[in-house]
């Protein structure tokens, strides 16, 4: 842990998957995220924490650098028709691309029918106990936050780490951080998983941390994306079409490009290559806006009309 010019801290990152998703990724084009690269190349190099000798600490990620706590989506409660398959593709891609540097630890979802008080819209201030009770579906993520807390505390207590980095804004983790502070000399870092400067980290977590990263930028998320195609033992994991910035614009362009190029892989290769006929822009980037998509579609339709039998769209 010692050394000239500051300590070298054996570091592990603990990611609260759903807290991270809802804080940083929901509705964004950054869901196909390489969590290991995000922390290794973006987050940790930005952290300046002074050790006892008033020299900056160095962050050295352990071989298992990231523990990612999540739960498999229940199909009956999924919000999208491809939610289950997309999550599975992402988890498989993470495990294969990060090759042992990232561990996925899963809890589970509980889906049950319960009775709960209904808000009285005629009198919103009416106490819940006085409101009508109705039957509802209750969705609960189970064990993820408990497992994160236990893993972080275990790793700190057994001397596996010199620094734990918690990527969550869930105050349920405060007792675990308190125990780490009370019973070990391990450094506690906090990363608030939000891109919104107006959503500050919870005070109770900040007070228990040696340092805090208050937000993650979109630039950092963009710089830490997995490749569109990730090889696995049998086959590949593909970034879901619905995880791009504008799937509604990408889908028709992909259909046209596949028609000409012959396969979806070849179509994506064309869409990912700067095109001189589109002023050097990458078609895939243009498909993030209505105006850009119109330019791409118009170009492809014109090209197809002029070259009906060719598969080598320029």
Summary of predicted features, one role per range:
Residues 1-124, 133-137, 187-189, 194:
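Domain-level signal for Mg2+-assisted phosphodiester chemistry and nucleotide/NA-binding surfaces
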Residues 6-7, 97, 155-159, 183, ...:
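Alpha-helix C-cap/termination motif
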Residues 45-49, 93, 151-155, 179, ...:
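A generic secondary-structure signal
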Residues 90, 148, 152, 173-176, ...:
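Amphipathic alpha-helical interface surfaces
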Residues 109-245:
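Nuclease catalytic cores that cleave nucleic-acid phosphodiester bonds
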Residues 237-314:
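Non-transmembrane "mature" sequence context
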């Amino acid at each position: 842990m010692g050394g000239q010019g500051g300590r070298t801290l054996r570091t592990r990152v603990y990611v609260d998957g759903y807290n991270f998703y809802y804080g940083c990724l929901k509705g964004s084009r950054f869901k196909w995220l390489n969590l290991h690269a995000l922390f290794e190349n973006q987050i940790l190099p930005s952290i300046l924490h002074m050790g006892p000798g008033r020299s900056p600490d160095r962050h050295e990620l352990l071989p298992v650098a990231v523990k990612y706590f999540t739960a498999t989506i229940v199909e009956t409660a999924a919000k999208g028709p491809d939610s289950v398959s997309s999550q599975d593709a992402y988890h498989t891609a993470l495990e294969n691309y990060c090759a042992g540097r990232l561990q996925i630890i899963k809890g589970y979802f509980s889906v049950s029918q319960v009775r709960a008080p209904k808000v009285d819209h005629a009198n919103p201030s009416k106490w819940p106990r006085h409101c009508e009770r109705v039957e509802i579906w209750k969705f609960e993520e189970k064990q993820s936050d408990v497992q994160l807390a236990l893993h972080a505390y275990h790793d700190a207590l057994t001397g596996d780490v010199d620094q734990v980095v918690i990527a969550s804004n869930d105050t349920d983790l405060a007792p675990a951080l308190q125990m780490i502070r009370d019973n070990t000399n391990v450094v506690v870092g906090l990363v608030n998983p939000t891109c919104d400067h107006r959503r500050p980290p919870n005070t109770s977590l900040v007070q228990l941390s040696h340092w805090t990263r208050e937000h993650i930028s979109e630039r950092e998320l963009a710089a830490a994306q997995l490749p569109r195609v990730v090889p696995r033992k049998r086959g590949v994991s593909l970034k879901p079409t619905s995880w791009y910035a504008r799937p509604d614009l990408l889908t028709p362009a992909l259909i046209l490009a596949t028609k000409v190029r012959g396969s979806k892989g070849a179509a994506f290769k064309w869409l990912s290559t700067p095109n001189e006929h589109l002023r050097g822009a990458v078609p895939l980037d243009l498909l993030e806006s209505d105006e850009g998509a119109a330019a791409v579609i118009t170009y492809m339709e014109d090209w197809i009309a002029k070259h009906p039998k060719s598969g080598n769209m320029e």
